[in-house]
UniProtKB/Swiss-Prot annotation:
Binds 2 Zn(2+) ions per monomer. GO terms for molecular function: ATP binding; heat shock protein binding; unfolded protein binding; zinc ion binding. Residues 5-70 form the J domain. The keyword Zinc-finger applies. PANTHER family: CHAPERONE PROTEIN DNAJ (PTHR43096:SF48), DNAJ HOMOLOG 1, MITOCHONDRIAL-RELATED (PTHR43096). Homodimer. This is Chaperone protein DnaJ. One of its GO terms (cellular component) is cytoplasm. Zn(2+) 1 binds at residues 144, 147, 197, 200. Zn(2+) 2 binds at residues 161, 164, 183, 186. Its cofactor is Zn(2+). Keywords: Chaperone, Cytoplasm, DNA replication, Metal-binding, Repeat, Stress response, Zinc, Zinc-finger. Belongs to the DnaJ family.
Amino acid sequence: MAKQDYYEILGVSKTAEEREIKKAYKRLAMKYHPDRNQGDKEAEAKFKEIKEAYEVLTDSQKRAAYDQYGHAAFEQGGMGGGGFGGGADFSDIFGDVFGDIFGGGRGRQRAARGADLRYNMELTLEEAVRGVTKEIRIPTLEECDVCHGSGAKPGTQPQTCPTCHGSGQVQMRQGFFAVQQTCPHCQGRGTLIKDPCNKCHGHGRVERSKTLSVKIPAGVDTGDRIRLAGEGEVGEHGAPAGDLYVQVQVKQHPIFEREGNNLYCEVPINFAMAALGGEIEVPTLDGRVKLKVPGETQTGKLFRMRGKGVKSVRGGAQGDLLCRVVVETPVGLNEKQKQLLQELQESFGGPTGEHNSPRSKSFFDGVKKFFDDLTR
């Protein structure tokens, strides 16, 4: 019968860290321990499985072998019999094949590329629309200026790894074959630091802050990301640096709202202007422009001003500015103004004057019909 996957036995993912594995083992071991389940053969068998899985997954060499070859790594005298070395060496015949399949290969493992960094940049709407150049200061890892990235104390050199003899790989028995595995002693680098640099302690990198000038193109919006190649953390022992990603966040504007490449704003007008029409000034990002408001304009009407929006960062036509009219009810009226409005209302035929207020007529006709239907 096929053996159960070790990760499934412990209930952890294949990327689980050692502390997660230990925590899962402790919980399951307490549950299935023979002392707590005396005479229960199933619990005893389960406890053995848990212990076996724990022993493999907390041993870095055994876990690496299991991840690549599964249970076969420990069968037919695999790692359990002799570990590294010994046995028939078919690496010249099968080395490239196993290297391609399992990601190992026979060459030395490359030093790790530096990590990518992220910087959150807040922009005003004006900066986002027009583009801007900003200086930023970021904490990062840079090459040690004492050992120049080698990790070794000045005057010394990294030593060849005695386990893999500088290849970064060791042979591991897999059934009838000997296949290549990353050296667990030097982690595939092929060298060891005997006398580490006093400044970087053998890492080849030190923490520093650096200042960069970042050019933000016109038209960016919240969520856009700008990549600065090679401006991330420097890699280990001379490996390439990672990248820096600048994440854009545009601040809320007191007047405009942005949707895609269009801008929206609310323009208040008094009811006399709405009824009679006229000309008003409206704001744009380039200054004030005149807008002609026709008579009988209702609240919510949109006026489109073409080309007054945002030019797309990806090219194409410039967006528009859409002005939404809001008709304001006057406040703080004096007696004369109230009298004039009263006369105006009476000239309409009362509060629900039908001739001059078609929407009011439609509304009250609907209300009347509703109550008429209820009384039938």
